[in-house]
Amino acid sequence: MSYKNQSDCNHLSKVIEKAEAGDKIFQSTLGTMYYQGDGVSIDYEKAFYWIKKSAAQEHINAMYNLGYMYWSGEGTSEDYEKAFYWFSKAAEQRFAPAQNYLGMMYRDGRGVDQDFEEAFVWFLIAANSTLSCSILAGKKGSSEAQCNLALMYIEGNGVPESQEEAGHWVNLAYGQGSEFAAEMIDEYELWDYID
């Protein structure tokens, strides 16, 4: 066995040991490792098990990830009400990706009654948030939430239609390198609003 492989085994053993001892950080780490196949085979059920243990101890990433797993049905049955609960717990801690998912749930009526105004509020909070610890989250507010706000302005859902406001939010997301924002700029002809 090479040193790198031995090192990987030692790291995994320590993560498992600390997770089994109840450390919420290592439980979340182990769950993420199983989810992504990082040093272990992908196993969504094991990922769900460890992430749920960590979320029960209010680890912010785990609460978000558990919400996502209920949202997507990975490692468990799809359950939008439970997804909403866990996204809400993480959103209360000002976690932008969870705030964005709450916006999507209100916009689409998944797990809650459809409410464009409430969706707008959550997208706005997420778009301006600086707490984005997730691997998938942006560093200057959630670019996904910024694009969702732009779509609300383009479609006039919960807000008056406004190309200018849509352009403002797409510009912020585009500045973070969002591919979705780049597609929106072309599709909705928002080039005049891009810095």
Please place each PLM-identified region on the residue numbering.
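Repeat-mediated protein-protein interaction surfaces in helical alpha-solenoids
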Residues: 7-18, 129-134
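Alpha-helical tetratricopeptide repeat
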Residues: 9-12, 16, 24-32, 52, ...
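Short helix-capping/linker turns of helical repeat alpha-solenoids
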Residues: 20-23, 36-38, 43, 56-59, ...
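TPR/TPR-like alpha-solenoid signature
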Residues: 28, 64, 85, 100, ...
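Hydrophobic face of amphipathic alpha-helices that form TPR/SEL1-like repeat modules
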Residues: 29-36, 63-72, 101-108, 148-155, ...
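Terminal, low-structured helical/coil segments at or just beyond the last alpha-helical repeat
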Residues: 172-195
